[in-house]
Amino acid sequence: MYDTIVVLDFGSQYSQLITRRVREAQVYCEMFPWNVDAARVMAMQPRGFILSGGPNSIYAPGAPQLPAFVLESGLPVLGICYGMQALTRALGGVVAASSEGEYGLAQIETLLPNPLLPPGIQPVWMSHGDRIESLPT
């Protein structure tokens, strides 16, 4: 049996790239739309989830929401952009509209050792109009 990561697509133009990069790391990865049937995903016995970005605001009418089975699974979850906002909101944090959007290159710094990210500063691309105002408690 393979270790499997599931990417849930919230409409990002980069979802295919994310899936491919996971596969290039020698990890089996499948991508599904955010509203996929839970039984279909959980039958794959994934080891974790990646939630993609997307063009919506988390508070827009009809905006995609985090499927309950993701948190109920107890598996590790990586939220990217909209996926992070959906995760934050589902866990009780607050997401708010930014006064202006931010687009372009940025840097993130890994402060604590972890198996997913290398230590130090990494270049990243950002494109968002909402922000995390307060983290879940």
Question: For each of these PLM feature ranges, what is it?
Answer:
Residues 20-26, 43-116, 120-123, 129-132:
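Cysteine-nucleophile active-site neighborhood
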Residues 7, 126-127:
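Short beta-strand segments
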Residues 4-25:
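Short, charged N-terminal beta->alpha structural module
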Residues 135-137:
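Short, intrinsically disordered, charge-balanced linker/junction segments flanking boundaries
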Residues 8-10, 34, 82:
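Cofactor-binding loop segments of dinucleotide-utilizing enzymes, especially the Rossmann-like FAD-
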Residues 26-42:
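A short, well-structured beta->alpha microelement
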Residues 13, 37, 85:
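Conserved Rossmann-like nucleotide-cofactor binding loop
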Residues 5, 29, 77:
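Hydrophobic anchor at the start of a short beta-strand
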